Amino acid sequence: MNTRSTFLASTLSVILLVLPVVSSAKPPKPTEEAKLQAKLFQKKLSKDEQVLHALDRLTFGPLPGDVERVKRIGLKKWIFEQLHPDRMTENPGLEAQLQVLESLRMTPLETLQHYPGPQMIRAIANGKQPMPDDLLLRASIERLITRYKVKQAEAAGLAAPPKDANADLEPVRTLEQILTPGELDTIRKGNPEQKRQLLESMQQDRLEDMLIAMNQKQRTQLFGAAPSPIRREIFLLNSPQQVVAYDLLDSKMLRAVESTRQLAEELDDFWFNHFNVFYEKGADRFLIPQYEREAIRPHVLGQFRDLLEATAKSPAMLFFLDNFESVRPDIDLNDTKRKVKRGLNENYGRELMELHTLGVNGGYTQKDVTEVARCFTGWGIQEPRKGGGFFYNDKLHDKGQKVVLGHVIAAGGGMEDGEQVLDILARHPSTAHFISKELAQRFVADNPPEQLVNKMAQTFLATNGSIREVMKTMLDSKEFWSEGAYRAKMKSPFEMVASSARALNANVIDGWALANQVGTLGEPLYRKLEPTGYSNLGTEWINSSALLERMNFALQLAQNHVESVKVDVSRFGDDPNAVAKILMFRSMSPQTRAAIDKALEDSKQKNAAMVAALVIGSPDFQKR
């Protein structure tokens, strides 16, 4: 049996062994063992367990040295730091990596101009937009224009344009003219590290000439070995809009793995899912970077009312839930100079109450949904497909009287009608309870004690929705520091991948490949179609198929088979329990230890990488 077959066989045996253990590790349903669970939430953790619990819940998993640091400065001081991220010094290495990701700092209009989508490509092809000056972008657009014209010709039943119809498309020089024979051999036959060294050594003009001379397949084959800046150039040549997606994925993984402001990153993920928008929906491809940068990240520990308004006025949300097209029902279409029929759209009004504030059982009716939708008519985007910002059009607003949850909003109002709705919802007791429960489900347990949720909700109402104060109430509670919460949640794919990289102290050169792994495990980042966002319930992420993928990921990571992620497992040795104490800061359960011992015995591959992979893929590591 060859090495590849042996590897696959050992992987399968491991998964078959750990599946029963993971299944038994699922927490009981709410109706089961209720008395036992209530007692567990009364039992206090030891001091050492409290440190591990804080690092498991308030970070994407501990780095080597984190436990010692928390013990040294004290748990209270460490929590205070995490609750005040603006006072912390960020990891300078992370900041340097993020600096390369230019689209994250651009306005939507700048993003469109630098990384155009199909609409702008067509505009340039038809002479309505100028060709950009940037050499790589120009080459990409010329290629895309040719593809567009070929499709046009095919649709019209005409002959395709001749190859020289766009002379600029043809490479000025071939690869043989640009590269030396040795360089050509490295590009075609070298291993990833040899290719990376060559790419990093090339001057920028030669590098650009080479990438332009390559076809799309050749550039794609080079992608795995390319460092981050060159990967972005490859994306730019293949499809400019891919750069924006690349930057989003790269930054999200880098921040989760490397940021010192771990709680802020946890909350960024929480709030983005709470106010979810879908990357693949039209203009949201270039609106999301601004959305996360300006509507989500500044408010993760701020006032909920500010966060609510920031998302309500964000072009990304207005576009995703179609509110930019919502107008008063009696609108005179001739006044708007539009041929497309428009009317009242209730999507945002419904999701605002059901998902963003009150919750599905929050006490609203269908009549309230309609009234809220009327209040937000006229809230739109200035030229949405051209990167415009929030724009209120009074001509499209319904000026009649509305009644929302028993509150009368007088006739004759304007944009303030929607703002009044946000006020009503932000201070509503149902919102306080719903938000508190969602936070408790993320950070405490899938079924958090109602007593804790009520305490958090009281703080929410007393502080006008201070997220920081609600989090402090949770962190000051006996329930958070109890056996009922300790290792009671299962990691989402995002948490599993990030915590694995952190536990192994991985050198993440580029977060894109890790983000792809998250997608493979079932949580493609920024691509949740439904406005619900991804679930906070850990039990929803565990099934046999998902566990197989998690074990495969662990094996790839530990054996350095994940692109642009380097780990050193030589320090671990091959004793599973010793490795578990390094990676999890605790011993394995007897069931997991027995399963791993059996897997190692059967596979005959007992080495540091295999042992580390089995620990990371084990049910014990899936818990947090």
State the predicted function of each range.
Residues 266-267, 305-306, 469-470, 608-611:
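Alpha-helical scaffolds flanking conserved acidic
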Residues 26-37, 176-182, 186-195, 199-242, ...:
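Active-site substrate-binding loop specific to GH73 endo-beta-N-acetylglucosaminidase modules
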